[in-house]
Every structure is written in structure tokens, then in C-alpha cells.
């Protein structure tokens, strides 16, 4: 899965959050590849790394439903095979591992299920108290990609309709106003329709924090 961020990330490991975010806030684009621990073939991991697009700047690791400790196993093996920074993108708190470089600390703002608005975050605190992970508060907005996604099933929430641009913009702004440092617009794994350029432009015009766009992106050109 391809993920586009409207701001770049350096290939070197950042140790201070202010440095990491400063790099995010520059003007170029970057490309992240999401690897789901529950779907990856570990025996072919080296081949997967070798065939990553040349434009890849970092990796996301995570999924909606992942066996406990599998994320840590995958991150550890990836770190041994690539210098690319690894961000964990957890579907729940059990996927958090200190082996990664950074954590997208997600709040599902497009839905109203308290489990994914705050309860998973509270459950993660004991793991995060003494972590070396860069923790990045992230507003996560599920956008309708034309088919039901695993995020929708697991979270028991509905995605935001693509035609409701103002509602999407307002939700993104609410995320920024509440202290989030990234906006994540997600059409979902296997989406038949990616987040429209109109939505991306409208959100980018209104927010002052970086935007990540994912789901339905099948090529570097997209």
C-alpha cells in the first residue's frame, strides 16, 4: 500500500520530536509503504524490501487486527534489512513496540466510538511511559473509499462521505485545535476510490499541520 505525505521525512533517524516535525513541515512530498504484519510473508521480506519503490522514504507498520508480538517481530527484521525510518501504525495498543522509530498516536476522529477516540490511547500509556519512541498525536479520518474496510469493521464506525468536504475539513481542524500534530486522511486498505484531490486541497488550505493521505493509492504517480 502506498501512502502519500505532503511533506518529506529524512532517511536519517530523528531523536527529537521537534526535529522530526520540522522536517515534516517542509514543502516536498514523500512516499511511505505500509506493511501489515498479519499479511506479510516473512520468508520473502528481503525480496519485498529490494522491490520497494525508489521514492520510498519511510515505512509504516501496522494493521487493524494483528497477533500480539507480531508487529515487534516484523519491525525488528525490517530494521535489520533497511535504514528507512519505521513508523508503527497500530490498530490497537498491543501492536506498540519500542523497536520502531516513531508512533502515529491515532485518534479516530471520523467516528464516535470511544474505544478508538480515547480508550485505546489510555490502555497504551503504561507501554509508552518510558519509551524511546517519537510519539506523534495524529487525527485519523476514515474517508469513504467505495467499499467496506477492515478499519470500519473493527472500529464499528462509518467513513465520512467524500462529498461532505466541509465536514471533513472541520473534523481535521478540530483535530488540529485539540493538539494533533498530523492529519491522516484514510480511504482504507483495498479502497476502490482514493481520497479526492479536492478533499486534500481543501484540508491543506485550512490546516497548518502536515497531512498524510492513504488508501486506494496504487502507484507513485497517484
Where do the model's predicted regions map?
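N-terminal amphipathic/basic-hydrophobic helices that include classical n-h-c signal peptides
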Residues: 1-13
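A structural signal for short, well-ordered beta-strand segments and their strand-loop junctions
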Residues: 5, 87-88
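N-terminal amphipathic alpha-helix/helix-capping segment at the start of soluble metabolic enzymes
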Residues: 11-35, 127-137, 144
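Alpha/beta enzyme core
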Residues: 37-66, 72-84, 90-132, 136-140, ...
Amino acid at each position: 500500500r502506498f501512502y502519500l505525505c505532503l511533506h518529506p521525512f529524512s532517511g536519517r533517524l530523528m531523536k527529537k520530536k521537534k526535529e522530526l516535525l520540522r522536517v515534516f513541515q517542509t514543502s516536498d512530498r514523500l512516499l511511505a509503504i505500509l506493511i501489515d504484519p498479519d499479511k506479510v510473508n516473512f520468508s520473502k521480506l528481503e525480496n519485498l524490501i529490494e522491490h520497494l519503490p525508489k521514492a520510498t522514504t519511510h515505512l509504516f507498520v501496522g494493521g487493524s487486527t494483528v497477533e500480539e508480538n507480531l508487529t515487534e517481530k516484523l519491525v525488528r527484521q525490517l530494521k535489520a534489512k533497511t535504514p528507512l525510518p519505521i513508523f508503527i501504525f497500530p490498530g490497537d495498543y498491543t501492536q506498540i513496540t519500542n523497536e520502531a522509530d516513531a508512533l502515529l498516536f491515532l485518534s479516530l476522529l471520523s467516528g464516535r466510538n470511544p474505544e478508538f477516540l480515547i480508550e485505546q490511547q489510555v490502555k497504551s500509556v503504561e507501554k509508552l511511559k518510558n519509551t524511546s519512541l517519537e510519539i506523534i498525536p495524529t487525527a485519523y479520518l476514515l474517508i469513504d473509499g467505495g467499499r467496506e474496510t477492515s478499519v470500519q469493521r473493527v472500529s464499528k464506525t462509518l467513513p465520512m462521505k467524500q462529498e461532505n468536504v466541509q465536514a471533513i475539513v472541520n473534523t481535521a481542524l478540530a483535530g488540529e485545535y485539540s493538539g494533533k500534530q498530523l492529519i491522516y486522511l484514510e480511504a482504507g486498505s483495498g479502497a476502490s476510490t482514493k481520497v479526492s484531490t479536492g478533499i486534500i486541497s481543501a484540508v491543506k488550505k485550512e490546516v497548518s499541520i502536515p497531512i498524510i493521505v492513504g488508501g486506494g493509492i496504487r502507484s507513485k504517480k497517484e
